A protein has these predicted regions:
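Short, flexible, solvent-exposed loop/turn segments with mixed acidic/basic and small polar residues
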Residues: 64-69, 165-166
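Interdomain hinge/lid region at the active-site interface
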Residues: 139-205
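Glycine-rich, N-terminal phosphate-binding loop of Rossmann-like dinucleotide-binding domains
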Residues: 2-4, 29, 79
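Residue-level detector of flexible, active-site-proximal loop/helix-junction positions
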Residues: 32, 55, 82, 109, ...
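Internal alpha-helical scaffold of NAD(P)-dependent oxidoreductase catalytic cores
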Residues: 69-154
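Rossmann-like NAD(P)(H) cofactor-binding subdomain of soluble oxidoreductases
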Residues: 11-63
Length: 205
């Protein structure tokens, strides 16, 4: 299953009658809790191994595919409690054959980790782009003068809005908690700047 996370979960019911007991069903979505809950609800736990290749770009669609995209990238697997160990081993071997690096995680742990290292950076990038758009000078000097650093940190802001809307909704509880802690860190940085705290500012960078 390789679609925005809402659609991946919705397709499960359509696939249930089409797969046999030997089948391995997987996905490549960035949120795991929601699809695992649907797998459990449908009684498909003996077939499902969640998957998430930690690779990609801001571009979406098969026309932007790359043959070597996941080489040397971590590939997270989130097997259900009831899937056979033989299936997990077989899928790990398949991932390894693609020259990716399989890592097994609990699906709840996956969503906390990706919420911090993937979902939060996308939110930061998008809000920064929107902030510059909303506060730019009348003649657009901010946009015109934005150089390498700004472009590096905001490149991912051009990712699929449908995909990221659904990720934020499906992993919302974790993302909200993580954002709260990040806002605290930004507040501390502001306080250090206001206080002209040279030592703290040096340590931050």
């Amino acid at each position: 299953l390789c679609a925005p996370v809402n659609y991946n979960a919705a397709y499960l019911s359509q696939l249930k009658s089409l797969i046999d007991s030997d089948c391995i069903l997987t996905d490549v979505g960035s949120v795991k809790t929601s699809i695992h809950k649907e797998v459990i609800r449908l009684g498909m736990e003996e077939s499902f191994i969640g998957g998430h290749p930690m690779a990609g770009s801001e571009k979406s669609g098969f026309m932007n595919s790359k043959a070597h995209l996941i080489e040397n990238a971590y590939y997270i697997l989130t097997p259900t409690a009831k899937v056979a160990k033989e299936k997990v081993s077989a899928y790990k071997e398949f991932v390894t054959s693609l020259k990716a690096l399989p890592v097994i995680l609990d699906y709840n742990e996956h969503d906390i980790i990706t919420g911090t290292i993937s979902h939060l950076p996308h939110i930061i990038a998008s809000t920064l782009v929107n902030f510059v758009h909303d506060t730019d000078t009348a003649d657009g000097l901010m946009k015109a003068l934005a150089a390498g650093g700004f472009k590096d940190i905001t490149r991912i802001a051009s990712s699929s809005p449908v995909m990221w809307q659904q990720i934020c909704l499906k992993n919302g509880e974790n993302i909200s908690h993580i954002l709260g802690h990040y806002i605290e860190a930004l507040t501390q940085a502001k306080e250090q700047i206001d206080a002209e705290n040279e030592t703290a500012l040096y340590s931050m960078f």
